[in-house]
């Protein structure tokens, strides 16, 4: 004999006015917040990744490749030095 879990059926949730009122506000808000997070450059600052114009400097135009996995830290330090 099977019982119920006490949860609302998914079809009841999707046809609920309350569901659509809440989600019609939160989904666009999350989209706008994400767009602002990236477009203002805050995402670059928070995660520490270089901005698109900082990948290549005037002095260093080659691609910085790590070739030795055991000396990777020293290679990263030498490639990130400002010359």
Swiss-Prot record:
Q: Does the keyword Iron-sulfur apply?
A: no
Q: Which residues cross the membrane?
A: 21-35
* Coiled-coil intervals, chain numbering: none
Ranked from the top, the taxonomy reads:
Eukaryota, Viridiplantae, Chlorophyta, Ulvophyceae, Oltmannsiellopsidales
Q: Where in the cell is it found?
A: Plastid, Chloroplast thylakoid membrane
- Cofactor(s) required for function per UniProt: heme b
Q: Where does heme bind?
A: 23
Topology relative to the membrane: Single-pass membrane protein
Write out the GO biological process terms: photosynthetic electron transport chain
Swiss-Prot/TrEMBL keywords: Chloroplast, Electron transport, Heme, Iron, Membrane, Metal-binding, Photosynthesis, Photosystem II, Plastid, Thylakoid, Transmembrane, Transmembrane helix, Transport
Under what name is this protein listed? Cytochrome b559 subunit alpha
Keyword Zinc-finger recorded:
no
Chief location of this protein within or outside the cell: plastid
Entry GO CC: chloroplast thylakoid membrane; photosystem II reaction center
Q: Which family does it belong to?
A: Belongs to the PsbE/PsbF family.
**Details of cofactor binding:** With its partner (PsbF) binds heme. PSII binds additional chlorophylls, carotenoids and specific lipids.
Q: Which Pfam families match?
A: Cytochrom_B559, Cytochrom_B559a
InterPro entries in alphabetical order: PSII_cyt_b559_asu, PSII_cyt_b559_asu_sf, PSII_cyt_b559_CS, PSII_cyt_b559_N, PSII_cytb559_asu_lum
Q: Name one GO molecular function term.
A: heme binding
């Amino acid at each position: 004999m099977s019982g119920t879990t006490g949860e609302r059926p998914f079809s009841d949730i999707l046809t609920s006015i309350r569901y659509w009122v809440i989600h019609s506000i939160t989904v666009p808000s999350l989209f706008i917040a994400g767009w602002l997070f990236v477009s203002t450059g805050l995402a670059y600052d928070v995660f520490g990744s270089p901005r698109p114009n900082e990948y290549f400097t005037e002095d260093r135009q080659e691609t910085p490749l790590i070739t030795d996995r055991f000396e990777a830290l020293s290679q990263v330090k030498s490639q990130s030095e400002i010359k």
